[in-house]
Amino acid sequence: MNYFFITGTSSGIGQALANVLLTDKNNIVTGISRSVTINSENYRHIKLDLNDIESVSKFDFGELKEPEIICLVNNSAHFSESKHYGKADTRDIIKNYNVNNISPGIIINNFLSAYQSYNCKRIIINISSGAATTAIESWSNYCSSKAALLMLSKVIALEQSLNYPSDPVKIYSVSPGVVDTPAQERIRNTSPENFSMVGKFIEFHEKKQLSDPVIVAEKIAKIIFNTDNFINTEIHVNDIQI
């Protein structure tokens, strides 16, 4: 069997990826989020708020019997309210780094602790963003947290190559592009006073330039099942053909 742990399965890319994987009865998907939106015989759900660090710290991966693939997908993210620094809400800043950095770090650490010694394919995919490498006004929290997650991916990849050169856990930072998700709707509803680029994102939507989450999910699945073809830690879905 193949086992998948995906954060943020209630909507967007996480939900789409879970549904894509669940088309194969050999795949068991565990969703990690605050709400359940998927009903499938092979779907399990763990209700967990990634802003609650104490609860996340207690989360533990269980023992798996004869797995062929074990994969963690850190998809969940908090997109802070678009405001310039000096006007940002302190609680929103804390939530951003809790959800986008601290919780993924804890979950990755627990995943490696649980499954490093397993004799099967083990994969970690961190969903990144163009914001990880581009400064965007009013997105200070999101840009910096995605940049931190990208660097975490690179460091773990380095550690795996040094400590387990013949059998590393594969880790990828995958940038999905501009995807039609609830986060995009929130961006389009931002006041131009707080985000001068809002018109560009409205145009993306009007011109139907947003990627379908299902297509993005299918490309992520291609990475998972073809890791030998993906050498670099950083991947953009636009470079993947399906």
What residues fall within each predicted segment?
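Rossmann-fold cofactor-recognition segment
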Residues: S40-E54
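N-terminal Rossmann NAD(P)H-binding glycine-rich loop of SDR-like oxidoreductase domains
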Residues: S10-N19
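Residue(s) in the substrate-gating loop at a strand-loop-helix junction
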Residues: S129
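Conserved mid-core segment of classical short-chain dehydrogenase/reductases
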Residues: H78-I94, S113, S138
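Active-site helix of classical SDR
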Residues: I108, S145, S153
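Active-site loop-to-helix junction immediately N-terminal to the catalytic Tyr of the SDR YXXXK motif
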Residues: A135-C143, V155
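C-terminal helical subdomain
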Residues: S173, T181, S191-I242
